[in-house]
Amino acid sequence: MEHYISLLIKSIFIENMALSFFLGMCTFLAVSKKVKTSFGLGVAVVVVLTIAVPVNNLVYNLVLKENALVEGVDLSFLNFITFIGVIAALVQILEMILDRFFPPLYNALGIFLPLITVNCAIFGGVSFMVQRDYNFAESVVYGFGAGVGWMLAIVALAGIREKMKYSDVPPGLRGLGITFITVGLMALGFMSFSGVQL
């Protein structure tokens, strides 16, 4: 149990997808203008990562890994296309659920919901799972932790950006300029966790 707790904390803070690996920056910067919308997208990313990482773990270990289906057959060259297909299917299912049961959130996320399919934070989580050879339980914990870490980062940035509306930002830095500086400072803050051994 201690191993899973340390993996969860590590994936949220130490190896934060957005602020340590800078994955998923497109939606991270574009949607982080309002906390409510950021939280909604963050929840969607948590759900997709929590499901996509373990499902792709099963697909990898039962089908794609060397000697998984037949002795001497290695289908690992299909990793990328298979993982992207599974992620796309999961995002489509999530999109249909949000459209049916949460129309305001669906409308607020707009084009960024289908973009979760190509959000490199999702694919990065799946790739790290394969690279680190996580078992099924570890992949569930890692997927959830990576999603929560990304959500924490985007909600924190949205809160800061909402407060910055009332700040006297120099004209040359208004908009994305000050946002990039803010993200850099947040990343420096998260770098302080890099020396923590769990």
UniProtKB/Swiss-Prot annotation:
UniProtKB keywords: Cell inner membrane, Cell membrane, Ion transport, Membrane, NAD, Sodium, Sodium transport, Translocase, Transmembrane, Transmembrane helix, Transport, Ubiquinone
Protein name: Na(+)-translocating NADH-quinone reductase subunit E
Domain of life according to the entry: Bacteria
One GO term of the biological process aspect: sodium ion transport
Subunit structure: Composed of six subunits; NqrA, NqrB, NqrC, NqrD, NqrE and NqrF.
EC number: 7.2.1.1
Family: Belongs to the NqrDE/RnfAE family.
This protein's GO CC annotations: Gram-negative-bacterium-type cell wall; plasma membrane
Main location: membrane
Reaction(s) catalysed by this chain's protein: a ubiquinone + n Na(+)(in) + NADH + H(+) = a ubiquinol + n Na(+)(out) + NAD(+)
TM annotation in the entry: 11-31, 39-59, 77-97, 110-130, 140-160, 176-196
GO molecular function, one term: oxidoreductase activity, acting on NAD(P)H, quinone or similar compound as acceptor
Membrane topology type: Multi-pass membrane protein
Subcellular location: Cell inner membrane
Residues of the signal peptide: none
Role: NQR complex catalyzes the reduction of ubiquinone-1 to ubiquinol by two successive reactions, coupled with the transport of Na(+) ions from the cytoplasm to the periplasm. NqrA to NqrE are probably involved in the second step, the conversion of ubisemiquinone to ubiquinol.
